[in-house]
């Protein structure tokens, strides 16, 4: 959801428990995808989880459904070894949207062009899969 007003600590703090659980889910996805491939260590990605959760769920003007919006904030991670955290975050957020749409039928939980644009948890099985 786009953040329209400047976020305040008081407004954001009511969600901190949800953010912690979201971070735990992202951490688990990172561990699973890297362990499946016996690839690298998760330290770089896992250290970025709290930052990404807090910025993308409240501090930034960013919408996972429409990241191309003209006034949306952008985030950039320079280190390539941090790619797993972005993949895991997108998988968790998109699964949450899918579940909410399934529960409510509300079209606002759909991602436009979802099949082509959404990274889903099944995609994590192919991280660093060469052949």
PLM region descriptions:
Residues 1-20:
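Non-catalytic, mobile gating and regulatory segments of ester bond hydrolases
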Residues 11, 30-36, 46-131:
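Cofactor-binding active-site loop characterized by glycine-rich and histidine/acidic residues
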Residues 16-30, 41:
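Conserved N-terminal diphosphate/IPP-binding helix and adjacent helical/loop segment
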């Amino acid at each position: 959801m786009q953040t329209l007003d400047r976020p305040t600590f008081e407004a954001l703090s009511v969600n901190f428990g949800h953010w912690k659980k979201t971070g735990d889910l992202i951490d688990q996805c990172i561990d699973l995808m890297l362990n499946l491939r016996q690839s690298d260590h998760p330290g770089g990605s896992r250290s970025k989880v709290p930052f990404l959760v807090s910025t993308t769920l409240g501090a930034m003007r960013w919408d996972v459904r429409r990241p191309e919006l003209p006034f949306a904030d952008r985030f950039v991670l320079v280190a390539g070894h941090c790619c797993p955290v972005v993949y895991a975050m997108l998988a968790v957020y998109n699964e949450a949207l899918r579940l909410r749409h399934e529960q409510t039928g509300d079209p606002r939980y759909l991602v436009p062009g979802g099949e082509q644009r959404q990274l889903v948890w099944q995609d994590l099985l192919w991280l660093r899969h060469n052949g």
